[in-house]
């Protein structure tokens, strides 16, 4: 036995082409195998994300830029987004208090810190599929059909900030109908997500903030009127999209689940209110602010509480 071991050691230590080839393979393959093992053994932690959605011209990109830079001046000029643009931001807490976004942006901000991605999505009608695809991705994860992450590394969606121009939401203005139609699609997708889970455990809630922007303008509506106007328009959209369903003479109890799933909010209700979305574990808040004047602290607090 000892003789065989001695011969093996002598062969290994004797320079030869075979020894050089084996040694080279070991040097090349071992680091690769170790890297693959460590990569598979260590789960990749994607940052939680907040989506910025809403009609074009509402101020989504300006809001994202303001929160990213944390400046005290006027909001910088921006251009219409063509693709989703994520930026990494930090929520800082000093004890139980959430620091304002200007302080959170500092490298030396006190307290604990948590990073997240704020994803600006295009508001143009032909490009809204980017936002809806991300919401659909959240639905797929809730139902267990998908384990993929977005291409930019964004993790689970924790909230949706729907930015609207508060000066373009008069009852007779076309801007109200356009904003409400987009919001209807967003809320409908989230409502369907609530029932998409395969298990008895409900998916994590995704709440919505309607950020009524441009309150610095004289013609801007206060948050309370933005809320009531949107609720009324959403009710009209719901009625038109479900036309004939309630007038068919069929009782509510006789309506199939598929038809009820296509009804936003409380089924059969005459008026729509955001409060009806609580049935699906969706809170909808309407808060006013102004990106131009930097008055976005209430929006920042809302975002920070979801991270």
Language-model features, listed with the residues they occupy:
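Core residues of folded domains in eukaryotic genome-function proteins
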Residues: 46-49, 83-87, 112-117, 156-160, ...
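Conserved GTPase G-domain signal focused on the G5
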Residues: 59-60, 290-307
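Structural signal for hydrophobic/aromatic residues that build the beta-strand cores
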Residues: 50-53, 63, 118-120, 160-163, ...
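Amphipathic alpha-helical interface elements that mediate macromolecular binding in regulatory proteins
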Residues: 27-28, 61-65, 116, 129, ...
């Amino acid at each position: 036995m000892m003789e065989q071991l001695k011969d093996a050691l002598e062969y290994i230590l004797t320079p030869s082409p075979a020894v050089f080839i084996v040694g080279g393979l070991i040097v090349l393959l071992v680091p690769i195998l170790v890297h693959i093992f460590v990569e598979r053994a260590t789960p990749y932690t994607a940052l939680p994300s907040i989506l910025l959605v809403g009609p074009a011209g509402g101020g989504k990109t300006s809001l994202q830029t303001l929160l990213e830079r944390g400046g005290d001046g006027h909001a910088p000029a921006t251009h219409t987004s063509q693709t989703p643009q994520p930026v990494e931001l930090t929520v800082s807490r000093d004890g139980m208090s959430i620091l304002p976004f200007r302080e959170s942006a500092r490298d030396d901000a006190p307290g604990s810190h948590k990073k997240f991605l704020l994803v600006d999505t295009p508001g143009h009608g032909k490009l809204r599929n980017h936002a809806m695809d991300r919401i659909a991705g959240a639905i797929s994860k809730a139902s267990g059909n998908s384990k993929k992450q977005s291409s930019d590394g964004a993790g689970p969606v924790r909230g949706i900030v729907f930015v609207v121009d508060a000066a373009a939401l008069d009852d007779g203005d076309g801007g109200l109908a356009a904003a409400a139609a987009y919001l209807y699609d967003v809320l409908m997708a989230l409502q369907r997500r609530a029932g998409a889970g395969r298990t008895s455990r409900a998916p994590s809630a995704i709440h919505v903030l309607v950020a009524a922007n441009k309150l610095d303008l004289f013609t801007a509506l206060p948050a309370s009127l933005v809320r009531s106007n949107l609720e009324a328009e959403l009710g009209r959209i719901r009625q038109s999209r479900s036309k004939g369903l309630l007038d068919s003479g069929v009782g509510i109890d006789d309506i199939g689940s598929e038809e009820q799933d296509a009804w936003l909010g409380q089924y059969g209700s005459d008026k729509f209110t955001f409060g009806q979305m609580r049935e699906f574990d969706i809170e909808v808040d309407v808060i006013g602010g102004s990106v131009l004047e930097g008055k976005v602290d209430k929006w920042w607090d809302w975002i920070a509480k979801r991270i």
